[in-house]
């Protein structure tokens, strides 16, 4: 629903865009590859608290689940995200029989953004590991009281089968999670920006997060962007990675921004977003906002902000706390 006009807007995936559930875009489910050999071979199990986003699913509401966690192998942007895009496209474009969808293997590879010119062996080498990682990603819904615990455990994809000789792919989803595939809070994610950011996974990950935000988003803290990338390097190095990724997003024409500081908190003010990487016919529709001037902070407030930073508490954390009350 377009809030400004009241018009119902249907979002349909094609080769240039995909409809992505907002929850998976905001959460750190798909993240950059850990570059260093030391980091790439340890701590590869990712654990994400998805309570705030996924307790809105009818499954969670019906059963009274109040905690949702996503656990599994670290899913990267360069291969795993594109395979997930292929899965979303497959369920959107083909007839779903029961809880399964079947399509030609070559077509599935194209939906994953893999050129058809690649050999069958190279296709398998790219798709097979990604399908294993995605199918190995567990989503658990639970509720615990003083005496008892209830928990429902499922997977991002229940099963995947392919046969290159017969040229088929079969994908099976949990029917109770179909709502996740067709979440009512969707945005249309343009793949043009993803394709323009080949091998720049940090920029790709920040793109999926920023594109999920509402129109005229509030300033985003540097700490929130660090959390979205879920890197293991020192904070100083992570800050450099975030700034480099933001600059890469500006270079391809996706956005413009200003980095400001309020107290001890560094923020990014987004002036506009252009997922098609070109200016609209009417640039006034972008409603660019001037950067907010840095506010003067009293010594008492500066001291409180410094204490919060030492405790690892961000402004985003405080905002969530007040919203939950």
Swiss-Prot record:
Origin: domain of life: Bacteria
Keywords on record: DNA replication, DNA-binding, Plasmid, Plasmid copy control
Chain positions covered by the region annotation Disordered: 279-298
One Pfam family linked to the record: Rep3_N
UniProt keyword annotation of Magnesium present: no
GO biological process, one term: DNA replication initiation
GO molecular function, one term: DNA-directed DNA polymerase activity
Protein family membership: Belongs to the initiator RepB protein family.
Function: This protein is essential for plasmid replication; it is involved in copy control functions. In vitro, binds to the DNA repeat units, BCDD'D'', EFG and HIJ.
Protein name: RepFIB replication protein A
Organism for this UniProt entry: Escherichia coli
Lineage per the UniProt record: Bacteria, Pseudomonadati, Pseudomonadota, Gammaproteobacteria, Enterobacterales
GN (gene name): repA
């Amino acid at each position: 629903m377009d809030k400004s006009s009241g018009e119902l807007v249907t979002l349909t995936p094609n080769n240039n865009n995909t409809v992505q559930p907002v929850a998976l875009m905001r959460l750190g489910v798909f993240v950059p590859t850990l570059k260093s050999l030391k980091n790439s071979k340890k701590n590869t199990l990712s654990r994400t608290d998805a309570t705030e986003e996924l307790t809105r699913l009818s499954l969670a509401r019906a059963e009274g689940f109040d905690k949702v966690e996503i656990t599994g192998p670290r899913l990267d942007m360069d291969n795993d995200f594109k395979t997930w895009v292929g899965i979303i496209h497959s369920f959107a474009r083909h007839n779903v029989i029961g809880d399964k969808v079947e399509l030609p293997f070559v077509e599935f590879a194209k939906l994953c953004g893999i050129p058809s010119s690649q050999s069958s062996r190279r296709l398998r080498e790219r798709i097979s590991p990604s399908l294993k990682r995605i199918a190995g990603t567990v989503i658990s819904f639970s509720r615990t009281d003083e005496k008892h615990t209830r928990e429902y455990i499922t997977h991002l994809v229940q099963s995947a089968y392919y046969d290159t000789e017969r040229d088929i792919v079969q994908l099976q989803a949990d029917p109770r999670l179909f709502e996740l595939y067709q979440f009512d809070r969707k945005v249309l994610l343009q793949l043009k920006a993803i394709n323009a950011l080949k091998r720049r996974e940090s920029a790709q990950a920040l793109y999926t997060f920023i594109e999920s935000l509402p129109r005229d988003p509030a300033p985003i803290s540097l700490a929130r962007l660090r959390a979205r990338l879920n890197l293991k390097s020192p904070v100083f190095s992570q800050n450099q990675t975030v700034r480099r990724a933001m600059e890469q997003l500006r270079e391809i024409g996706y956005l413009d921004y200003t980095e400001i500081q309020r107290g001890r908190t560094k923020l990014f003010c987004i002036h506009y977003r252009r997922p098609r990487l070109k200016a609209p016919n009417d640039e006034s529709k972008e409603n660019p906002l001037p950067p907010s001037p840095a506010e003067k902070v009293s010594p008492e407030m500066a001291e409180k902000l410094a204490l919060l930073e030492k405790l690892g508490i961000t402004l985003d954390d405080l905002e969530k706390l007040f919203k939950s009350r």
